[in-house]
């Protein structure tokens, strides 16, 4: 085992190769479900490495996006050092830095079991999970849209308004920033909006794969919820999938989002059994 004389410092662009090796070769690599690759954050001041004798052995990145919400975008460490040692050194630095910048809500979608005890030992709370649902191929009817409402393809020019819809539909912890949406849009396979009198009311953004699609985001302004607008966007997406000869559609949502779960279940989605805990920590 390495001597454990770890020094934590801000990550630098010159660390790119060492970090790439850690991410590629090591068994313990946590990556956030994101539109950006972990090393895209390398120039962020919220990215640190732990090294011994100039050798990078661990890394953590948690840049706030949107402001005030810092997801753990990356945590990885060499198999030559204990996970708890790497985490405690890096998390102590990150927590102190976040506090000095005014604080943040820190979140982790822990897909891998090895990471979860470290978070609980650091007093992270576990208020909810992400659950996966899959459409079972049942035909759906397109709900009638309210008078004056129009469904159309999303364009890049819509993105600032799309970000407004997103912020109006979700709490800050779950909001997608404009920068995130600008990265997501070119990667989408099918994205649509609902508008009335030139104002965007709702949107969906989906990605594609060989067998079907994944509904990555569905948002409806709070004041317009309850009018089956979300159902209309999902029904249109299902129609698009069927027209392309595809048969699979998946979606993730929060385990405690009853409105969302009810919508998807009514439209023929069933839970797959996959579930990922969401841990939170408030840095004041």
Which residues does each PLM region occupy?
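A short beta-loop-alpha structural element at the N-terminal edge
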Residues: 5-19, 150-162
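Active-site rim helix/loop that mediates acceptor-substrate recognition in acyltransferases
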Residues: 23-53, 61, 169-201, 205
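Conserved donor-binding loop and adjoining core beta-sheet/short helix segment
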Residues: 24, 34-92, 96, 204-216, ...
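Acyl-donor-binding surface of acyltransferase catalytic domains
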Residues: 66-68, 78-147, 275-281
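Conserved acetyl-CoA-binding loop-helix of GNAT-fold acetyltransferases
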Residues: 82-96, 220, 226-239, 243, ...
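Conserved hydrophobic beta-strand within the GNAT/NAT acetyltransferase core sheet
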Residues: 106-109, 215, 249-253
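Conserved active-site alpha-helix within GNAT-family acetyltransferase domains
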Residues: 110-129, 227, 231, 255-273
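Glycine/small-residue-rich hydrophobic helix-like segments
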Residues: 181-244
């Amino acid at each position: 085992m390495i001597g454990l004389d770890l020094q934590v410092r801000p990550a630098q662009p010159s660390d790119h190769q060492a970090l790439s090796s850690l991410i590629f070769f090591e068994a313990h690599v946590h990556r956030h479900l994101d539109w950006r690759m972990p090393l895209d954050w390398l120039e962020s001041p919220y990215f640190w490495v732990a090294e011994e004798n100039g050798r990078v052995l661990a890394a953590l990145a948690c840049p706030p996006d949107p402001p005030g919400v810092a997801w753990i975008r990356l945590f990885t460490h060499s198999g030559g050092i204990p996970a708890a040692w790497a985490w405690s050194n890096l998390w102590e630095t990150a927590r102190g830095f976040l506090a000095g910048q005014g604080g943040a809500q820190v979140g982790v979608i822990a897909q891998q079991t090895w990471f979860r005890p470290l978070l609980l030992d650091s007093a992270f709370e576990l208020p909810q999970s992400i659950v996966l649902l899959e459409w079972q191929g049942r035909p759906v009817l397109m709900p009638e849209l309210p008078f004056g409402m129009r469904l159309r393809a999303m364009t890049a020019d819509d993105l600032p308004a799309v970000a407004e819809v997103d912020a109006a539909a979700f709490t800050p912890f779950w909001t997608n920033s404009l920068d995130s949406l600008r990265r997501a849009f070119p990667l989408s396979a099918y994205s649509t909006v609902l508008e009335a009198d030139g104002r965007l009311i709702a949107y969906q953004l989906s990605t594609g794969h060989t067998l079907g699609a994944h509904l990555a985001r569905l948002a409806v302004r709070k004041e317009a919820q309850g009018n089956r607008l979300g159902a209309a966007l999902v029904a249109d997406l299902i129609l698009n999938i069927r027209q392309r000869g595809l048969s699979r559609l998946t979606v993730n949502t929060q385990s405690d989002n009853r409105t969302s779960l009810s919508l998807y279940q009514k439209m023929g989605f069933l839970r797959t059994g996959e579930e990922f805990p969401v841990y939170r920590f408030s840095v004041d």
